[in-house]
């Protein structure tokens, strides 16, 4: 099965706790898949969060404050993407208009409006027209009606989490929404849980968290991702300040290093444009995550369709 057109996979990235790396993960994975190889893949990011972090902070896009997505959810209006924010990468912007939708969700249900059906229909139309291979939905932590809508639409769920109990509590709450969506007929599958912002040398602590997560996921047919995303505070500041992903920081760090060396050779005071000096390890973490995501998609879809993912 090839990753094209109406066959675009829809991956929801969610956790019912904020600050666990959802938006950062969406941006990093989307950019790497879109840029991979000579042609890359066509990727659409749907920022389903009223805070719009992946739109504004991670990708540096000035969107429509969530207006297009809100109109789709409420009125089945066509989705209007911000095109070519990176090569092969489009964005449906998030923003505060989505908070209005979430607050009025019960009224829409009373009036027979099916937000999930509207979004699923318009995503299918847009994916077929634009030839998207992958759709990544970034979900906010607190708006349950919106979260339930995305769970009903997505094919797969990826859950980033930190190793603290509050974040793991968010995983547990989301797991309950996931199972509820499945009971209501959603076809969504759990792709895996990603441990984010951790010390890779804290192997005992990380294994303890893996064990807790595995217990939460029992019966889901999947396990946590083997890769963890390392803690990199300086790179995190640079990514949000410069609106770049971990992969994009690597080239910028090289340019920054060369510029500072050139100024030193000319006896000038170098100005540091970035806080991080070497983001290659962080970028490698995300590259391995992308590899594992593609491998899991291939395994799931081979079992479902008897074919390999192309």
Regions found by a protein language model. Give the residues of each.
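P-loop NTP-binding core
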Residues: 1-310
């Amino acid at each position: 099965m090839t990753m094209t057109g109406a066959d675009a996979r829809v991956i929801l990235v969610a956790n019912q706790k904020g600050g666990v790396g959802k938006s950062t993960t969406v941006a990093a994975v989307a950019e790497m898949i879109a840029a991979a190889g000579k042609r890359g893949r066509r990727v659409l990011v749907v920022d389903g969060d009223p805070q719009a972090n992946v739109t504004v902070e991670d990708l540096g896009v000035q969107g429509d404050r969530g207006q297009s997505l809100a109109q789709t959810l409420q009125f089945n209006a066509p989705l209007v993407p911000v095109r070519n924010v990176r090569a092969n990468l489009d964005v449906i912007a998030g923003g505060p208009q989505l908070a209005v939708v979430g607050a009025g969700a019960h009224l829409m249900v009373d009036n027979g409006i099916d937000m999930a059906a509207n979004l699923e229909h318009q995503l299918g139309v847009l994916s077929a027209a634009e030839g998207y291979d992958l759709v990544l939905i970034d979900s906010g932590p607190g708006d349950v009606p919106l979260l339930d809508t995305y769970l009903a639409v997505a094919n797969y769920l990826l859950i980033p989490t930190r190793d603290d109990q509050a974040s793991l509590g968010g995983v547990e709450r989301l797991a309950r929404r996931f199972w509820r969506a499945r009971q209501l007929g959603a076809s969504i599958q759990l792709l895996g849980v990603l441990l984010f912002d951790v010390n890779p040398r804290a192997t005992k602590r990380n294994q303890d968290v893996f064990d807790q997560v595995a217990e939460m996921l029992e019966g889901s047919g999947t396990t946590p991702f083997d890769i963890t995303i390392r803690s990199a505070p300086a790179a995190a500041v640079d990514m949000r300040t410069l609106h770049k992903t971990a992969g994009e920081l690597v080239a910028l760090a090289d340019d920054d290093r060369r510029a500072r060396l050139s100024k030193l050779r000319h006896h000038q005071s170098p100005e540091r444009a970035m806080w991080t000096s070497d983001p290659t390890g962080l970028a490698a973490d995300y590259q391995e995550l992308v590899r594992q995501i593609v491998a899991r998609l291939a395994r799931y879809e081979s079992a479902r369709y008897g074919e390999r993912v192309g």
